[in-house]
Structures are given as structure tokens and as C-alpha cells.
Amino acid sequence: MAQKPLEGAQLAWMTVALAMATFMQVLDSTIANVAIPTIAGNLGSSNSQGTWVITSFGVANAISIPITGWLAKRIGEVRLFLWSTALFALASWLCGISNSLGMLIFFRVIQGLVAGPLIPLSQSLLLNNYPPAKRSMALALWSMTVIVAPIFGPILGGYISDNYHWGWIFFINIPIGLFVILVAMATLKGRETKTEIKPIDTVGLVLLIVGIGSLQVMLDQGKELDWFNSTEIIVLTVVAVVALVFLVVWELTDDHPVVDLSLFKSRNFTIGCLCISLAYMLYFGSIVLLPQLLQEVYGYTATWAGLASAPIGLLPVLLSPIIGKFGNRLDMRRLVTFSFVMYAVCFYWRAYTFEPGMDFGASAWPQFIQGFAIACFFMPLITITLSGLPPERMAAASSLSNFTRTLAGSIGTSITTTLWTQRESQHHSQLAEFVNPYSPQSQEMYRQLEQVGMSKQQASAYIANEITAQGLIISANEIFWLAAGVFLILLALVWVAKPPFSSGGGGGGGGAH
């Protein structure tokens, strides 16, 4: 941008507005998850049908994120941000008043489409309007909202669905959206980016919609339909692969691509995207797995499972401003290295301590300590990713990097939940082999259970439940071990990035120096 960076109260209010927009969008991607049984029951549908409330949003959102850079070039970043926020608030209201599942799914598609530009543009507008010396602080504050929102989403969603009409899951976006619009209009007035009318890449757009849409539906519905034992999943996979291969070829040869894949010619952009995506895949998979484990094995309610996960957000809130202030004095690769080491430590910690009879603290403490890893994760990796890019490419780079991160989160969720289920089945079979009428240990176990008043059938049911719980814990611990190992491998990848690193953006600091 040619404009002078914002300062003082105007800068502070802009930061709050952009952070709230990010928080609102990320929150909405997880808040409905725990409320699906309530929503489905209220609308006269099954839980499996209700999952389309999540899938529809995810598919539409995944399609719209990568075209944000192209839209911003045509419309302008500020104008696109304001329209996206307004339409998101409107779509939220329409979701809340829906009286059928089909109506709700339709408006969730609209909501997902208009939500796509919010995160990339909030990041781009922050960087382009902050003084160069304070851009690390801007990224740190922005990162805080991306991390905290998915943790509080299930807690808030569970509380609302337990105590109020489920529509309030969506209605809460309306006052936030209005606040964001009013503040953004006041602080970003006259700061519109340069627009450029380019031909519409119709072929690329169609390939993107078909490829990403098929891939996202496949990831969301794969477990429900038993993956590749389902014809539907096989067809979706083939369509996604073919469309995405053609998309890459087309976009690399088209004069006006809808997705600027040439960004991957930058070593730092490629390394940054890989590290963010793979790490976020592991992180997001774990925050989906942990509440399910606590509810299914340890009998936690949805609210208490959310509270056990919530400590992960405490340290980032405290440390992000400090890291943002002093982080630019350090080699960003060192901060990321510390983050990945702490991630590995916490995953190993869980693998060692998760066992039957585990108390609340055993699950909450690793979450709390993992906050160190998260605080040193987003800001330095985004800085590496965007370093050396000119201001006019910031929106496209931000949208593409956020798309890879979002897609990685979906992949992480699918892989984690599928592995957990499949490994549990294997461990259940192995453990059940030790329980048979001829085993002295089994006979003793039945005798002890019958002594406390259980019938033979009750004792068998109790033992079967214990075997299932053991299988779920063992399979979860295997996933934790695997995640820790991948984080240690990622340590080497981040050092392929090449300094110097700047926080991106315009005005005197946008490129490599």
C-alpha cells in the first residue's frame, strides 16, 4: 500500500476488528460440532444427516479461500472484507432461523462461501497497515485468535445447545459482525487496495470447485461411509484427483489464473506452507481426538471435555504479545524449532500418561504446557511464509497459505479419527483373546465381579466395555507417538528456509532485504 501505516487508537481498533473477524470465522468452523445431535433431533433428522451441517460449511469454505486473492484484485481488499463480513452475519441469521435441515444446509453453504475471504484478508490487511517494526506483533495477535477459537468453539456450542435454542450458535455472529463492519469502515476508510479487472479464469474456477468440493466431501464423509469400501468415496476420490491435476496444469499455464500457484516458486513460501500445514494437521487432529477420548472412555460431559482441552489457549494469550514484540530479533527458525520440540514433548507426555483411571489434571497439564509450542508456532511460520513477497501479492499468498492450512486440518481430522477407530478394533480383538472361559485370569475376573453382585451377563458386558476402553486408549497413545515423531522430522524441514525473514507487507518492508 502507498498509504502511511496506521498508528495509535486507529491501529488498535483496526487490530481488534480484524482479530474479531478471524475469531468469528474460526469459531464457526467448530462451534456446531457438539450441537449436531441437538440440531438434528430438533429438525427431525438423524445424526448422520446432521453431519452435513458441518460438511456443507467446510466444502464451501475450502472452495472460496483460495480464490480470495483473485477476488481482492478485482474488488479491493477492504471492500471484499466488508462485504464478506456483512454477508457472513446475514447468513448466520438465516442459519439460526432455519426450520428444516435442507434449509440449514443451504444457508451453511452460503455462510461457508462468504467466510472464505475473512481469514486471508484479516491477515493481509493487518500486515499492510501496520508499521514494519510492529508487524511481528500484528501476526502474534492474529495467531492468538486462530488458536483460541477452535478450542472455545465446542465449549460454547455445548453450553448453548444444553441451555438455549441451538440457533444462538449462529445468532452470536450477528453483533460481532456488526461491530467488525463499523470499526473496519472507520479505521480503513480511504485505504482501499488497487484493483485490476482481469478476465475470469472460468476453466480454473470450475476445476477448483469440482476438485476441492469432491476432496472435502470425501474427507468429511469418508469415515461415515467406511472409506474405500464405499463406491461414493471412490468416485469422489477419482473426481478430486483428476480435477486437481488438471487444475494445477491449467493454472500454471493460464495468463490470469484464479489461484496463483507461482507463489510456490518462492522457497520460503513453500517451506512455510509445508510446515504450517503438516503441523496444523497434527495439532487439529489432536484437538478433535482429545475431547472424544475423554467423553467415550472417561465419561466426561461435552463441557468438561472442552474445559480439559481449554488450557492450551492460556499461554498463547499471555506469551503472544511478548513474542510479537521481541520475536523479530531472533531467527524465526529457532522459534519454530522450539515450538516443534515442545509439541513433540507434549505428545510423548500424553502417550506415557494416558491410562485407565486418569484424572483431570493428567489430561489438562499437557494441554497447558503445549501452549508454549503454540505461542511460538504461527507468528514465525507466517513470517517465513510471506517473507520476500511484495505487498500486492500478500492477499493471494495469505489466501493460498490459509487454504493449505485449512485443508490440512480436514485431512488431519479424517486421518486421526479413522486411525483411532481402526486401531481400536485391532487392539480390541487382541485383548479379547485373553478373555475366554478356559483362562484362569478370566475365571478369577468373573468370580470377583460376581462377588460384588454382578450376574454373568453383567460381568461380560463390564469386561467388554473395559476392553473397548483399553483399545481406545492404546490407539490414541499410538497416534500421540506418531505425531511426536512427525514433529521431530519437521525440525529439519524448517531449516531449509532461507533468511532474511520479514513480516511481509508493504511500506518499507515488504520484500527480502
Say what each PLM segment does:
Residues 143, 151-152, 286, 363-441:
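Small-residue-rich alpha-helical segments with characteristic i,i+4
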Residues 9-73, 78-84, 92, 96, ...:
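Transmembrane core module of solute transporters
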Residues 37, 161-162, 220, 291, ...:
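Juxtamembrane/transmembrane-helix interface segments of polytopic membrane transporters
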Residues 182-202, 249-258, 355-356, 426, ...:
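Helix-loop junctions on the cytosolic side of multi-pass membrane transporters
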Residues 65-204:
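Helix-loop-helix hairpins in multi-pass membrane proteins, especially solute transporters
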Residues 34, 66-67, 121, 151, ...:
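Residue-level hotspots within transmembrane alpha-helices of multi-pass secondary transporters
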Residues 175-193, 210-221, 239-253, 491-498:
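C-terminal membrane-cytosol helix-exit motif in multi-pass small-molecule transporters
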Residues 9, 49, 179, 405-499, ...:
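Hydrophobic transmembrane architecture of multi-pass small-molecule transporters
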